[in-house]
């Protein structure tokens, strides 16, 4: 399978690129080449908002869009003339208001999440544009990722505290729930879409 992955050098996109290379897939990564590339990937070196003709005569079995934060990110990629069979957009559970019951369910109301500000709304707008424009589009709304190549010390903190037998405090008198999703589980689930 020929896969285009947006990003490819940091955390989720890097793990995904390396995962699919290890499975024998032909993996192309779209990024600005500002960080080292993973072994076995084919680099498409450019800014996703200024693609020009980088995709002339290119066809992918799958686009795995991990780095789109706004509808403009998706519009720019689609305007490039890229040809593909399926498009998977990694959105976010930030599209659900924090007042929704957790764990979040796909059929819950979406809207502003005061914790995430415009991030969730921008992801919602990107989802809507993609679904209105692309027939074979799939949206995933994962919660907090953790795992290999994590570049921020957030999600690992409670795990580290548990391993080290240290206390950590959960907001809202311990009633605030958080969902975690290992990046390896994301890659394993993608083969079933």
For each feature predicted by the language model, list its residue ranges.
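N-terminal Rossmann NAD(P)H-binding glycine-rich loop of SDR-like oxidoreductase domains
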Residues: 3-23
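N-terminal Rossmann-fold cofactor-binding loop
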Residues: 30-34
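NAD(P)H-binding glycine-rich loop region in Rossmannoid oxidoreductase-like domains
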Residues: 35-36, 42-89, 95-98
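Conserved Rossmann-fold NAD(P)-dependent oxidoreductase catalytic core, especially the SDR/UDP-sugar
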Residues: 76-122, 130-133, 138
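Conserved beta-loop-beta element that borders a ligand/cofactor-binding pocket
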Residues: 127-149
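Glycine/proline-rich active-site loop of Rossmann-fold NAD(P)-dependent oxidoreductases
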Residues: 147-157
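A conserved pocket-lining segment of Rossmann-fold NAD(P)-dependent short-chain dehydrogenase/reductase
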Residues: 161-181
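Conserved small/polar residues in nucleotide/adenosyl-binding loops
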Residues: 191-193
């Amino acid at each position: 399978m020929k896969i285009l992955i947006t990003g490819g050098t940091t955390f989720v996109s890097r793990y995904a690129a390396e995962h699919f290379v290890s499975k024998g897939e032909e993996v192309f990564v779209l990024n600005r080449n500002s960080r080292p590339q993973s072994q076995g990937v084919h680099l498409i070196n450019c800014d996703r908002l200024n693609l020009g003709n980088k995709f002339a005569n290119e066809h992918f079995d799958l686009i795995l869009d991990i780095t789109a934060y706004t509808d403009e990110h998706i519009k720019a990629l689609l305007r490039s003339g890229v040809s593909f069979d399926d498009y998977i957009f990694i959105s976010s559970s930030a599209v659900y208001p924090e007042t929704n019951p957790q764990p979040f369910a796909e059929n819950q109301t979406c809207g502003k999440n005061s914790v995430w500000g415009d991030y969730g709304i921008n992801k919602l707008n990107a989802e809507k544009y993609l679904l209105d424009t692309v027939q074979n589009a799939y949206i995933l709304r994962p919660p907090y990722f953790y795992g290999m190549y994590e570049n921020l010390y957030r999600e690992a903190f409670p795990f580290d505290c548990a391993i080290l037998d240290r206390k950590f405090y959960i907001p809202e008198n311990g009633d605030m729930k958080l969902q975690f999703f290992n990046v390896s589980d994301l890659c394993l689930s993608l083969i079933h879409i």
